[in-house]
Amino acid sequence: MIELTVAQIAEIVGGAVADISPQDAAHRRVTGTVEFDSRAIGPGGLFLALPGARADGHDHAASAVAAGAAVVLAARPVGVPAIVVPPVAAPNVLAGVLEHDNDGSGAAVLAALAKLATAVAAQLVAGGLTIIGITGSSGKTSTKDLMAAVLAPLGEVVAPPGSFNNELGHPWTVLRATRRTDYLILEMAARHHGNIAALAEIAPPSIGVVLNVGTAHLGEFGSREVIAQTKAELPQAVPHSGAVVLNADDPAVAAMAKLTAARVVRVSRDNTGDVWAGPVSLDELARPRFTLHAHDAQAEVRLGVCGDHQVTNALCAAAVALECGASVEQVAAALTAAPPVSRHRMQVTTRGDGVTVIDDAYNANPDSMRAGLQALAWIAHQPEATRRSWAVLGEMAELGEDAIAEHDRIGRLAVRLDVSRLVVVGTGRSISAMHHGAVLEGAWGSGEATADHGADRTAVNVADGDAALALLRAELRPGDVVLVKASNAAGLGAVADALVADDTCGSVRP
Protein backbone atom coordinates (compact mmCIF):
# COMPACT_ATOMS: atom_id res chain seq x y z
CA MET A 1 0.00 0.00 0.00
CA ILE A 2 1.10 3.56 -0.54
CA GLU A 3 2.12 5.42 2.61
CA LEU A 4 -0.68 7.44 4.21
CA THR A 5 -1.10 9.05 7.60
CA VAL A 6 -3.77 7.88 10.00
CA ALA A 7 -5.49 11.25 9.55
CA GLN A 8 -5.50 10.88 5.76
CA ILE A 9 -7.04 7.42 5.97
CA ALA A 10 -9.68 8.65 8.42
CA GLU A 11 -10.64 11.42 6.01
CA ILE A 12 -10.83 9.02 3.06
CA VAL A 13 -13.08 6.50 4.83
CA GLY A 14 -15.18 9.04 6.74
CA GLY A 15 -14.09 7.77 10.14
CA ALA A 16 -13.07 9.36 13.43
CA VAL A 17 -9.81 8.68 15.22
CA ALA A 18 -9.95 7.11 18.68
CA ASP A 19 -7.30 6.54 21.34
CA ILE A 20 -4.89 8.72 19.38
CA SER A 21 -4.61 12.51 19.39
CA PRO A 22 -5.29 14.49 16.20
CA GLN A 23 -1.66 15.61 16.26
CA ASP A 24 -0.36 12.04 16.43
CA ALA A 25 -2.85 10.94 13.75
CA ALA A 26 -1.45 13.59 11.43
CA HIS A 27 2.07 12.21 11.83
CA ARG A 28 1.62 8.46 12.35
CA ARG A 29 1.93 6.71 9.00
CA VAL A 30 0.71 3.39 7.67
CA THR A 31 3.74 2.00 5.87
CA GLY A 32 2.98 -1.72 5.92
CA THR A 33 0.29 -4.00 4.59
CA VAL A 34 -3.43 -4.19 5.28
CA GLU A 35 -4.39 -7.38 7.12
CA PHE A 36 -7.55 -8.92 8.54
CA ASP A 37 -5.63 -11.61 10.46
CA SER A 38 -3.85 -10.19 13.50
CA ARG A 39 -1.23 -12.95 13.19
CA ALA A 40 -0.20 -11.61 9.77
CA ILE A 41 0.21 -7.98 10.78
CA GLY A 42 3.64 -6.40 10.55
CA PRO A 43 5.28 -3.09 11.43
CA GLY A 44 3.35 -0.10 10.14
CA GLY A 45 0.38 -2.18 9.05
CA LEU A 46 -3.35 -1.45 9.03
CA PHE A 47 -5.45 -4.03 10.87
CA LEU A 48 -9.08 -4.62 9.85
CA ALA A 49 -11.32 -5.50 12.80
CA LEU A 50 -13.78 -7.88 11.16
CA PRO A 51 -16.16 -10.41 12.73
CA GLY A 52 -15.38 -14.08 12.12
CA ALA A 53 -16.79 -17.50 12.86
CA ARG A 54 -14.75 -18.00 16.03
CA ALA A 55 -13.60 -14.51 16.99
CA ASP A 56 -14.23 -10.82 16.39
CA GLY A 57 -11.29 -8.82 15.09
CA HIS A 58 -12.14 -6.05 17.55
CA ASP A 59 -11.04 -8.42 20.32
CA HIS A 60 -7.63 -8.83 18.67
CA ALA A 61 -6.95 -5.14 18.04
CA ALA A 62 -4.55 -4.79 20.96
CA SER A 63 -2.49 -7.79 19.86
CA ALA A 64 -2.34 -6.39 16.32
CA VAL A 65 -0.99 -3.08 17.58
CA ALA A 66 1.45 -4.90 19.83
CA ALA A 67 2.67 -6.75 16.73
CA GLY A 68 3.36 -3.45 14.98
CA ALA A 69 0.10 -2.24 13.46
CA ALA A 70 0.05 1.53 13.13
CA VAL A 71 -3.72 1.71 13.51
CA VAL A 72 -6.90 -0.37 13.51
CA LEU A 73 -9.88 0.16 11.21
CA ALA A 74 -12.85 -0.65 13.44
CA ALA A 75 -16.54 -0.07 14.04
CA ARG A 76 -16.06 0.89 17.70
CA PRO A 77 -13.23 2.09 19.97
CA VAL A 78 -10.87 -0.76 20.85
CA GLY A 79 -8.54 0.80 23.42
CA VAL A 80 -5.67 1.27 20.97
CA PRO A 81 -5.18 3.76 18.10
CA ALA A 82 -8.08 3.26 15.71
CA ILE A 83 -10.11 4.79 12.92
CA VAL A 84 -13.73 4.19 13.88
CA VAL A 85 -16.51 4.03 11.29
CA PRO A 86 -20.18 3.71 12.32
CA PRO A 87 -21.96 0.36 11.78
CA VAL A 88 -24.11 0.11 8.66
CA ALA A 89 -26.59 -2.33 7.16
CA ALA A 90 -24.86 -5.16 5.32
CA PRO A 91 -25.07 -4.83 1.53
CA ASN A 92 -25.79 -7.75 -0.77
CA VAL A 93 -22.23 -9.02 -1.05
CA LEU A 94 -20.16 -12.16 -1.29
CA ALA A 95 -17.81 -11.77 1.61
CA GLY A 96 -18.16 -14.63 4.07
CA VAL A 97 -16.99 -12.26 6.79
CA LEU A 98 -20.49 -10.78 6.87
CA GLU A 99 -22.02 -14.16 7.66
CA HIS A 100 -21.14 -13.46 11.29
CA ASP A 101 -21.85 -9.72 11.22
CA ASN A 102 -24.65 -9.37 13.74
CA ASP A 103 -24.37 -5.65 14.41
CA GLY A 104 -23.25 -4.06 11.13
CA SER A 105 -19.65 -3.68 12.26
CA GLY A 106 -18.30 -5.95 9.52
CA ALA A 107 -20.27 -4.12 6.84
CA ALA A 108 -18.94 -0.80 8.13
CA VAL A 109 -15.30 -1.88 8.04
CA LEU A 110 -15.79 -3.49 4.63
CA ALA A 111 -17.35 -0.30 3.22
CA ALA A 112 -14.46 1.75 4.62
CA LEU A 113 -11.97 -0.67 3.10
CA ALA A 114 -13.61 -0.19 -0.30
CA LYS A 115 -13.34 3.60 0.03
CA LEU A 116 -9.67 3.35 0.93
CA ALA A 117 -8.93 0.99 -1.97
CA THR A 118 -10.81 3.28 -4.37
CA ALA A 119 -8.73 6.29 -3.35
CA VAL A 120 -5.45 4.39 -3.53
CA ALA A 121 -6.29 2.87 -6.92
CA ALA A 122 -7.08 6.32 -8.33
CA GLN A 123 -3.70 7.64 -7.18
CA LEU A 124 -1.83 4.69 -8.64
CA VAL A 125 -3.66 4.80 -11.98
CA ALA A 126 -2.76 8.49 -12.25
CA GLY A 127 0.85 7.39 -11.81
CA GLY A 128 0.67 4.85 -14.63
CA LEU A 129 -0.73 1.66 -13.07
CA THR A 130 -2.55 -0.71 -15.45
CA ILE A 131 -5.49 -2.55 -13.86
CA ILE A 132 -6.69 -5.81 -15.41
CA GLY A 133 -9.98 -7.40 -14.34
CA ILE A 134 -10.85 -11.05 -14.94
CA THR A 135 -14.26 -12.67 -14.61
CA GLY A 136 -15.91 -15.90 -15.68
CA SER A 137 -17.81 -18.79 -14.20
CA SER A 138 -14.62 -20.86 -14.00
CA GLY A 139 -10.92 -20.49 -14.69
CA LYS A 140 -10.36 -17.07 -13.10
CA THR A 141 -7.60 -18.16 -10.75
CA SER A 142 -5.75 -20.30 -13.31
CA THR A 143 -5.91 -17.44 -15.82
CA LYS A 144 -4.74 -14.96 -13.18
CA ASP A 145 -1.71 -17.14 -12.45
CA LEU A 146 -0.82 -17.44 -16.15
CA MET A 147 -1.35 -13.71 -16.64
CA ALA A 148 0.96 -12.84 -13.76
CA ALA A 149 3.62 -15.03 -15.36
CA VAL A 150 3.39 -13.43 -18.81
CA LEU A 151 3.32 -9.87 -17.42
CA ALA A 152 6.25 -10.38 -15.04
CA PRO A 153 8.89 -9.76 -17.74
CA LEU A 154 7.22 -6.41 -18.49
CA GLY A 155 7.17 -4.96 -14.98
CA GLU A 156 6.17 -5.43 -11.36
CA VAL A 157 2.92 -7.38 -10.98
CA VAL A 158 0.50 -7.63 -8.07
CA ALA A 159 -2.09 -10.40 -8.21
CA PRO A 160 -4.28 -11.96 -5.52
CA PRO A 161 -3.13 -15.13 -3.81
CA GLY A 162 -5.55 -17.97 -4.43
CA SER A 163 -9.07 -16.69 -5.08
CA PHE A 164 -9.24 -13.36 -3.29
CA ASN A 165 -12.00 -12.07 -5.53
CA ASN A 166 -14.90 -10.75 -3.47
CA GLU A 167 -15.72 -7.59 -1.52
CA LEU A 168 -12.97 -8.36 0.99
CA GLY A 169 -10.29 -9.97 -1.18
CA HIS A 170 -10.68 -7.48 -4.03
CA PRO A 171 -9.89 -4.24 -2.12
CA TRP A 172 -7.33 -6.13 -0.01
CA THR A 173 -5.51 -7.02 -3.24
CA VAL A 174 -5.76 -3.43 -4.53
CA LEU A 175 -4.03 -2.26 -1.37
CA ARG A 176 -1.09 -4.62 -2.00
CA ALA A 177 -0.10 -2.38 -4.91
CA THR A 178 2.52 0.32 -4.41
CA ARG A 179 3.93 3.13 -6.51
CA ARG A 180 6.36 0.58 -7.96
CA THR A 181 3.55 -1.65 -9.26
CA ASP A 182 3.08 -1.66 -13.03
CA TYR A 183 0.25 -4.20 -13.38
CA LEU A 184 -2.54 -5.01 -10.95
CA ILE A 185 -4.49 -8.19 -11.77
CA LEU A 186 -7.87 -8.57 -10.10
CA GLU A 187 -10.28 -11.49 -10.12
CA MET A 188 -13.93 -10.45 -10.01
CA ALA A 189 -16.43 -12.94 -8.65
CA ALA A 190 -20.17 -12.56 -8.22
CA ARG A 191 -23.18 -14.23 -6.70
CA HIS A 192 -25.64 -11.46 -7.48
CA HIS A 193 -26.33 -8.98 -10.25
CA GLY A 194 -24.34 -5.80 -9.60
CA ASN A 195 -21.45 -7.44 -7.72
CA ILE A 196 -18.94 -7.08 -10.56
CA ALA A 197 -19.99 -3.51 -11.29
CA ALA A 198 -19.36 -2.67 -7.63
CA LEU A 199 -15.89 -4.24 -7.71
CA ALA A 200 -15.07 -2.39 -10.93
CA GLU A 201 -15.95 0.91 -9.25
CA ILE A 202 -13.31 0.26 -6.60
CA ALA A 203 -10.52 -0.25 -9.13
CA PRO A 204 -11.68 0.60 -12.67
CA PRO A 205 -9.91 -1.75 -15.11
CA SER A 206 -8.37 -0.55 -18.35
CA ILE A 207 -8.33 -4.15 -19.59
CA GLY A 208 -11.19 -6.57 -18.92
CA VAL A 209 -11.20 -10.31 -19.56
CA VAL A 210 -14.31 -12.52 -19.73
CA LEU A 211 -13.55 -16.24 -19.83
CA ASN A 212 -16.91 -17.98 -19.96
CA VAL A 213 -20.51 -18.04 -18.82
CA GLY A 214 -21.33 -21.29 -17.07
CA THR A 215 -23.53 -22.50 -14.26
CA ALA A 216 -21.42 -21.69 -11.19
CA HIS A 217 -23.64 -20.17 -8.46
CA LEU A 218 -26.71 -20.88 -10.60
CA GLY A 219 -28.79 -21.25 -7.46
CA GLU A 220 -27.92 -17.69 -6.45
CA PHE A 221 -28.46 -16.13 -9.88
CA GLY A 222 -31.55 -18.04 -10.92
CA SER A 223 -30.67 -18.42 -14.60
CA ARG A 224 -27.73 -18.57 -16.98
CA GLU A 225 -29.04 -15.39 -18.62
CA VAL A 226 -28.63 -13.47 -15.36
CA ILE A 227 -25.13 -14.91 -14.99
CA ALA A 228 -24.29 -13.57 -18.46
CA GLN A 229 -25.72 -10.15 -17.61
CA THR A 230 -23.61 -10.04 -14.45
CA LYS A 231 -20.39 -11.08 -16.18
CA ALA A 232 -21.10 -8.39 -18.80
CA GLU A 233 -20.74 -5.75 -16.09
CA LEU A 234 -16.97 -6.04 -16.54
CA PRO A 235 -16.75 -5.14 -20.26
CA GLN A 236 -19.31 -2.41 -19.64
CA ALA A 237 -16.99 -0.92 -17.02
CA VAL A 238 -13.96 -0.69 -19.32
CA PRO A 239 -13.64 2.78 -20.93
CA HIS A 240 -13.37 3.39 -24.66
CA SER A 241 -9.63 3.90 -24.24
CA GLY A 242 -9.25 0.38 -22.87
CA ALA A 243 -9.52 -3.14 -24.24
CA VAL A 244 -11.81 -6.08 -23.55
CA VAL A 245 -10.60 -9.64 -24.13
CA LEU A 246 -13.47 -12.01 -24.92
CA ASN A 247 -13.54 -15.78 -25.36
CA ALA A 248 -15.13 -15.94 -28.81
CA ASP A 249 -15.71 -19.69 -28.46
CA ASP A 250 -18.39 -19.02 -25.83
CA PRO A 251 -21.44 -17.48 -27.57
CA ALA A 252 -22.63 -15.75 -24.40
CA VAL A 253 -19.22 -14.10 -23.99
CA ALA A 254 -18.86 -13.26 -27.67
CA ALA A 255 -22.18 -11.39 -27.51
CA MET A 256 -20.68 -8.98 -24.97
CA ALA A 257 -18.74 -7.27 -27.77
CA LYS A 258 -21.88 -5.22 -28.39
CA LEU A 259 -22.02 -4.02 -24.80
CA THR A 260 -18.66 -2.31 -24.41
CA ALA A 261 -17.24 0.98 -25.62
CA ALA A 262 -13.73 -0.47 -25.44
CA ARG A 263 -11.76 -2.10 -28.22
CA VAL A 264 -12.55 -5.82 -28.40
CA VAL A 265 -9.86 -8.51 -28.67
CA ARG A 266 -11.26 -11.95 -29.43
CA VAL A 267 -9.47 -15.17 -28.51
CA SER A 268 -10.36 -18.51 -30.02
CA ARG A 269 -9.17 -22.04 -30.60
CA ASP A 270 -9.46 -21.42 -34.33
CA ASN A 271 -8.31 -18.70 -36.69
CA THR A 272 -11.43 -16.57 -36.22
CA GLY A 273 -9.79 -14.98 -33.17
CA ASP A 274 -7.41 -12.04 -33.02
CA VAL A 275 -5.33 -14.25 -30.74
CA TRP A 276 -5.75 -17.93 -31.44
CA ALA A 277 -4.34 -21.39 -30.92
CA GLY A 278 -3.32 -23.75 -33.68
CA PRO A 279 -3.95 -27.48 -33.40
CA VAL A 280 -3.95 -28.48 -29.74
CA SER A 281 -2.42 -31.69 -28.47
CA LEU A 282 -1.97 -33.02 -24.94
CA ASP A 283 1.02 -34.80 -23.46
CA GLU A 284 0.84 -37.80 -21.12
CA LEU A 285 -0.20 -35.55 -18.20
CA ALA A 286 -2.83 -33.67 -20.23
CA ARG A 287 -0.65 -30.57 -20.58
CA PRO A 288 -1.60 -28.67 -23.76
CA ARG A 289 0.73 -27.98 -26.68
CA PHE A 290 -0.27 -25.51 -29.38
CA THR A 291 0.89 -22.76 -31.71
CA LEU A 292 0.08 -19.25 -30.53
CA HIS A 293 -0.98 -16.94 -33.38
CA ALA A 294 -1.33 -13.14 -33.13
CA HIS A 295 -0.17 -9.99 -34.91
CA ASP A 296 0.93 -11.98 -37.99
CA ALA A 297 3.38 -13.93 -35.84
CA GLN A 298 3.38 -17.34 -34.24
CA ALA A 299 5.27 -19.29 -31.60
CA GLU A 300 5.05 -22.70 -29.98
CA VAL A 301 3.62 -23.05 -26.47
CA ARG A 302 4.03 -26.01 -24.12
CA LEU A 303 1.94 -25.35 -21.03
CA GLY A 304 3.01 -26.66 -17.66
CA VAL A 305 -0.58 -26.74 -16.37
CA CYS A 306 -2.97 -29.64 -16.79
CA GLY A 307 -6.17 -29.80 -18.83
CA ASP A 308 -7.38 -28.97 -22.32
CA HIS A 309 -9.48 -26.15 -20.85
CA GLN A 310 -6.25 -24.32 -19.97
CA VAL A 311 -5.81 -23.38 -23.64
CA THR A 312 -8.47 -20.67 -23.46
CA ASN A 313 -7.05 -19.45 -20.15
CA ALA A 314 -3.61 -19.18 -21.74
CA LEU A 315 -4.98 -17.35 -24.79
CA CYS A 316 -6.66 -14.75 -22.57
CA ALA A 317 -3.44 -14.25 -20.61
CA ALA A 318 -1.54 -13.94 -23.89
CA ALA A 319 -3.97 -11.36 -25.26
CA VAL A 320 -3.49 -9.17 -22.18
CA ALA A 321 0.30 -9.38 -22.37
CA LEU A 322 0.20 -8.48 -26.06
CA GLU A 323 -1.96 -5.46 -25.21
CA CYS A 324 0.70 -4.43 -22.70
CA GLY A 325 3.48 -4.54 -25.29
CA ALA A 326 4.89 -8.07 -25.18
CA SER A 327 5.83 -9.89 -28.37
CA VAL A 328 4.32 -13.22 -29.39
CA GLU A 329 7.68 -14.89 -28.77
CA GLN A 330 7.94 -13.37 -25.28
CA VAL A 331 4.43 -14.49 -24.41
CA ALA A 332 4.97 -18.03 -25.66
CA ALA A 333 8.19 -18.34 -23.66
CA ALA A 334 6.54 -17.05 -20.49
CA LEU A 335 3.53 -19.36 -20.87
CA THR A 336 5.80 -22.34 -21.39
CA ALA A 337 7.82 -21.50 -18.29
CA ALA A 338 4.78 -20.85 -16.07
CA PRO A 339 4.29 -23.54 -13.40
CA PRO A 340 1.06 -24.26 -11.50
CA VAL A 341 0.84 -21.69 -8.71
CA SER A 342 -2.41 -21.73 -6.72
CA ARG A 343 -2.98 -24.74 -4.49
CA HIS A 344 -5.74 -27.27 -5.14
CA ARG A 345 -6.23 -26.16 -8.75
CA MET A 346 -5.26 -28.88 -11.23
CA GLN A 347 -2.03 -29.57 -9.34
CA VAL A 348 -0.60 -32.81 -10.70
CA THR A 349 1.81 -34.79 -8.52
CA THR A 350 3.24 -38.21 -9.36
CA ARG A 351 4.33 -40.11 -6.29
CA GLY A 352 7.35 -42.36 -6.14
CA ASP A 353 5.10 -45.41 -6.46
CA GLY A 354 3.70 -44.08 -9.74
CA VAL A 355 0.36 -42.92 -8.32
CA THR A 356 -0.62 -39.62 -9.95
CA VAL A 357 -2.76 -37.25 -7.88
CA ILE A 358 -4.74 -34.53 -9.68
CA ASP A 359 -5.64 -32.06 -6.96
CA ASP A 360 -8.46 -29.79 -8.14
CA ALA A 361 -10.21 -29.67 -4.80
CA TYR A 362 -10.58 -25.93 -4.34
CA ASN A 363 -13.85 -25.50 -6.19
CA ALA A 364 -16.27 -27.20 -8.54
CA ASN A 365 -19.12 -26.44 -10.89
CA PRO A 366 -20.46 -28.54 -13.77
CA ASP A 367 -18.07 -27.05 -16.33
CA SER A 368 -14.92 -27.42 -14.24
CA MET A 369 -16.00 -30.89 -13.08
CA ARG A 370 -16.27 -32.02 -16.69
CA ALA A 371 -12.86 -30.54 -17.45
CA GLY A 372 -11.31 -32.37 -14.51
CA LEU A 373 -12.84 -35.70 -15.49
CA GLN A 374 -11.68 -35.30 -19.07
CA ALA A 375 -8.12 -34.65 -17.89
CA LEU A 376 -8.30 -37.73 -15.66
CA ALA A 377 -9.50 -39.87 -18.54
CA TRP A 378 -6.75 -38.59 -20.84
CA ILE A 379 -3.98 -39.31 -18.35
CA ALA A 380 -5.34 -42.77 -17.55
CA HIS A 381 -5.87 -43.91 -21.13
CA GLN A 382 -2.56 -43.34 -22.86
CA PRO A 383 -1.68 -45.56 -25.86
CA GLU A 384 1.42 -46.87 -24.10
CA ALA A 385 -0.45 -48.08 -21.03
CA THR A 386 -3.93 -47.85 -19.55
CA ARG A 387 -3.89 -46.94 -15.88
CA ARG A 388 -6.61 -47.47 -13.32
CA SER A 389 -8.44 -44.19 -12.66
CA TRP A 390 -10.19 -42.84 -9.58
CA ALA A 391 -12.56 -39.88 -9.41
CA VAL A 392 -13.06 -38.70 -5.82
CA LEU A 393 -15.86 -36.17 -6.15
CA GLY A 394 -17.82 -34.07 -3.69
CA GLU A 395 -20.76 -31.74 -3.96
CA MET A 396 -20.99 -28.85 -6.41
CA ALA A 397 -22.51 -26.07 -4.31
CA GLU A 398 -25.03 -23.35 -5.16
CA LEU A 399 -26.68 -24.93 -8.20
CA GLY A 400 -30.23 -24.33 -6.98
CA GLU A 401 -33.01 -26.31 -8.58
CA ASP A 402 -30.58 -27.74 -11.15
CA ALA A 403 -28.42 -29.40 -8.48
CA ILE A 404 -29.94 -32.88 -8.76
CA ALA A 405 -29.78 -32.97 -12.57
CA GLU A 406 -26.24 -31.59 -12.73
CA HIS A 407 -24.90 -34.07 -10.18
CA ASP A 408 -26.63 -36.89 -12.04
CA ARG A 409 -24.93 -35.80 -15.28
CA ILE A 410 -21.50 -35.80 -13.65
CA GLY A 411 -22.02 -39.32 -12.31
CA ARG A 412 -23.02 -40.51 -15.77
CA LEU A 413 -20.08 -38.71 -17.39
CA ALA A 414 -17.66 -40.58 -15.15
CA VAL A 415 -19.00 -43.84 -16.57
CA ARG A 416 -18.87 -42.62 -20.17
CA LEU A 417 -15.25 -41.59 -19.69
CA ASP A 418 -14.47 -45.10 -18.41
CA VAL A 419 -13.36 -44.00 -14.95
CA SER A 420 -12.41 -47.15 -13.04
CA ARG A 421 -13.60 -46.09 -9.59
CA LEU A 422 -15.97 -43.28 -8.67
CA VAL A 423 -15.91 -42.30 -5.00
CA VAL A 424 -18.75 -39.89 -4.24
CA VAL A 425 -18.09 -38.09 -0.95
CA GLY A 426 -20.80 -36.70 1.30
CA THR A 427 -24.48 -36.96 2.03
CA GLY A 428 -27.67 -35.40 0.75
CA ARG A 429 -29.80 -35.50 -2.38
CA SER A 430 -27.20 -34.05 -4.75
CA ILE A 431 -24.55 -36.55 -3.67
CA SER A 432 -27.05 -39.40 -4.02
CA ALA A 433 -27.93 -38.16 -7.50
CA MET A 434 -24.27 -38.31 -8.58
CA HIS A 435 -23.88 -41.85 -7.28
CA HIS A 436 -27.17 -43.08 -8.71
CA GLY A 437 -26.45 -41.44 -12.06
CA ALA A 438 -23.24 -43.44 -12.35
CA VAL A 439 -24.96 -46.67 -11.33
CA LEU A 440 -27.84 -46.17 -13.77
CA GLU A 441 -25.51 -45.23 -16.61
CA GLY A 442 -23.27 -48.27 -16.29
CA ALA A 443 -24.88 -50.68 -13.79
CA TRP A 444 -21.55 -50.86 -12.04
CA GLY A 445 -22.47 -49.72 -8.57
CA SER A 446 -22.85 -53.13 -6.96
CA GLY A 447 -19.20 -54.04 -7.36
CA GLU A 448 -20.11 -57.43 -8.84
CA ALA A 449 -17.67 -58.69 -11.43
CA THR A 450 -18.81 -59.16 -15.02
CA ALA A 451 -17.06 -60.10 -18.22
CA ASP A 452 -16.52 -56.44 -19.00
CA HIS A 453 -16.06 -54.91 -15.57
CA GLY A 454 -14.04 -56.39 -12.75
CA ALA A 455 -15.11 -56.17 -9.15
CA ASP A 456 -12.93 -53.08 -8.68
CA ARG A 457 -14.83 -51.08 -11.30
CA THR A 458 -17.46 -49.62 -8.98
CA ALA A 459 -19.16 -46.45 -7.89
CA VAL A 460 -19.36 -45.98 -4.13
CA ASN A 461 -20.72 -43.32 -1.80
CA VAL A 462 -18.78 -42.59 1.40
CA ALA A 463 -19.81 -40.26 4.19
CA ASP A 464 -16.83 -37.90 4.35
CA GLY A 465 -13.24 -37.19 3.41
CA ASP A 466 -11.86 -39.43 6.14
CA ALA A 467 -13.80 -42.38 4.77
CA ALA A 468 -12.66 -41.58 1.23
CA LEU A 469 -9.03 -41.40 2.34
CA ALA A 470 -9.29 -44.71 4.20
CA LEU A 471 -10.71 -46.36 1.08
CA LEU A 472 -7.98 -44.93 -1.13
CA ARG A 473 -5.21 -45.93 1.24
CA ALA A 474 -6.54 -49.46 1.33
CA GLU A 475 -7.08 -49.93 -2.39
CA LEU A 476 -4.74 -47.67 -4.39
CA ARG A 477 -2.22 -49.53 -6.52
CA PRO A 478 1.07 -48.29 -7.99
CA GLY A 479 0.38 -46.41 -11.22
CA ASP A 480 -3.22 -45.41 -10.41
CA VAL A 481 -4.46 -41.91 -11.30
CA VAL A 482 -6.65 -40.05 -8.78
CA LEU A 483 -8.71 -36.89 -9.37
CA VAL A 484 -9.89 -35.11 -6.21
CA LYS A 485 -12.50 -32.42 -6.88
CA ALA A 486 -15.39 -30.70 -5.12
CA SER A 487 -16.58 -27.31 -3.99
CA ASN A 488 -14.25 -25.92 -1.35
CA ALA A 489 -16.75 -26.41 1.48
CA ALA A 490 -16.52 -30.18 1.00
CA GLY A 491 -12.99 -30.07 2.41
CA LEU A 492 -11.50 -32.56 -0.05
CA GLY A 493 -8.29 -30.54 -0.28
CA ALA A 494 -7.23 -32.36 2.89
CA VAL A 495 -7.73 -35.68 1.10
CA ALA A 496 -5.51 -34.59 -1.79
CA ASP A 497 -2.86 -33.27 0.61
CA ALA A 498 -2.87 -36.54 2.52
CA LEU A 499 -2.53 -38.62 -0.65
CA VAL A 500 0.51 -36.62 -1.71
CA ALA A 501 1.97 -36.73 1.80
CA ASP A 502 1.56 -40.53 1.89
CA ASP A 503 4.35 -40.82 -0.67
CA THR A 504 7.39 -42.48 0.88
CA CYS A 505 9.46 -42.66 -2.29
CA GLY A 506 9.62 -39.01 -3.31
CA SER A 507 7.03 -37.29 -5.47
CA VAL A 508 7.46 -35.32 -8.66
CA ARG A 509 5.47 -32.23 -9.65
CA PRO A 510 5.87 -31.65 -13.37
Swiss-Prot record:
Gene symbol of the encoding locus: murF
Family matches, as NCBIfam families: murF
Family label: Belongs to the MurCDEF family. MurF subfamily.
GO-annotated cellular components: cytoplasm
Subcellular location: Cytoplasm
Alphabetical UniProt keywords: ATP-binding, Cell cycle, Cell division, Cell shape, Cell wall biogenesis/degradation, Cytoplasm, Ligase, Nucleotide-binding, Peptidoglycan synthesis
InterPro entries: Mur-like_cat_sf (IPR036565), Mur_ligase_C (IPR004101), Mur_ligase_C_dom_sf (IPR036615), Mur_ligase_cen (IPR013221), Mur_ligase_N (IPR000713), MurCDEF_CellWall_CoF430Synth (IPR051046), MurE/MurF_N (IPR035911), UDP-N-AcMur_synth (IPR005863)
PANTHER family named among the record's database cross-references: UDP-N-ACETYLMURAMOYL-TRIPEPTIDE--D-ALANYL-D-ALANINE LIGASE (PTHR43024:SF1)
Predominant subcellular localization, coarse grouping: cytoplasm
Miscellaneous comment text of the record: Was identified as a high-confidence drug target.
GO terms of biological process kind: cell division; cell wall organization; peptidoglycan biosynthetic process; regulation of cell shape
Species annotation: Mycobacterium tuberculosis (strain ATCC 25618 / H37Rv)
Molecular-function GO terms, alphabetical: ATP binding; UDP-N-acetylmuramoyl-tripeptide-D-alanyl-D-alanine ligase activity; UDP-N-acetylmuramoylalanyl-D-glutamyl-2,6-diaminopimelate-D-alanyl-D-alanine ligase activity
Superkingdom of origin: Bacteria
Listed name of the protein: UDP-N-acetylmuramoyl-tripeptide--D-alanyl-D-alanine ligase
Pfam families: Mur_ligase, Mur_ligase_C, Mur_ligase_M
Catalysed transformations (reactions): D-alanyl-D-alanine + UDP-N-acetyl-alpha-D-muramoyl-L-alanyl-gamma-D-glutamyl-meso-2,6-diaminopimelate + ATP = UDP-N-acetyl-alpha-D-muramoyl-L-alanyl-gamma-D-glutamyl-meso-2,6-diaminopimeloyl-D-alanyl-D-alanine + ADP + phosphate + H(+)
The UniProt record lists the keyword ATP-binding: yes
Function description: Involved in cell wall formation. Catalyzes the final step in the synthesis of UDP-N-acetylmuramoyl-pentapeptide, the precursor of murein.
Residues where ATP binds: G136, S137, S138, G139, K140, T141, S142
EC number: 6.3.2.10
